[in-house]
Amino acid sequence: VGFPPQKTLTLFDTGSSDLVLDKAAYNPKWSLSSKNLHKQFDFSYGSQHVAGDLYTDKVAIGGVKASNVPIGHGNGDFNSGNGGTFGLSFSNSENSAFDVQQLPFTWAAKKQHLIQSSTYQFTLRPTGKATLNVGRVDLFELAGPITWSDKNTDHTFWRITTELNGNKIENAIADTGTNFIGGPPDQVKALLDNLDGVSVELAEDGSYGGFYSCQNPPHLSFKVLGQTFDFPEPAMNFGFNGDKCRLAIFSTPGMQEWILGSPFFETASVILNYDVRRMGFAKYR
């Protein structure tokens, strides 16, 4: 970020649309290319909250450097373990905390002719190398054909319908910024009840969770756009409860729709094409 560049670690988040950096992760005063927009922002991310000032600056990821990208510079540090959040959902008045005219990185890079296609390829292997390709699809990451969705009609989030062991999860938000798979309590319970090798428990807050034997994990797979992708055990494992493992699928209080978080992204190479608003899925090597 900036010039000279300030290197920082961000969470690439398909569930939000803004680039928000912690106070310690970026100092606009050290950048010759920063511009103070003299506007403020107020940003909520999960249970975290940050406010601060809006700037524009140079931003580079994956070898692609765009100029005049809006950045929220927090007045504190809100993102534990990361320097900030790099939003990759669709930017609009409903989804953005920024009241600015400047384009977010996804569109700025395309308009400035830095990439031919506004395409982002996530290949998140649960045990091994994870990559994000910007502006292109790396076919060497793939072990099979790409299946493409129809045009995404939601102007805020990426959405997809999938099946887990034959149980349909419909029109779910695909969100790399959430570290579990969740949905409405009654629907989560119904799905977990249908999974062999998974026991269902009700928590005091009314949420449902699934548990399985760590020595004998269930065989789970997602069916997406006609292709089947195994749910690897390291991706489905959300932690331990005694001698049992907690499944990374559970409900949380007040959850009204399904969210396919990062464990879902660890099952396939997932491609987001902003130009035609489609998602692609393929097996990874």
Indicate residue ranges for each PLM-predicted region.
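Aspartyl protease catalytic domain
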Residues: 67-167, 244-251
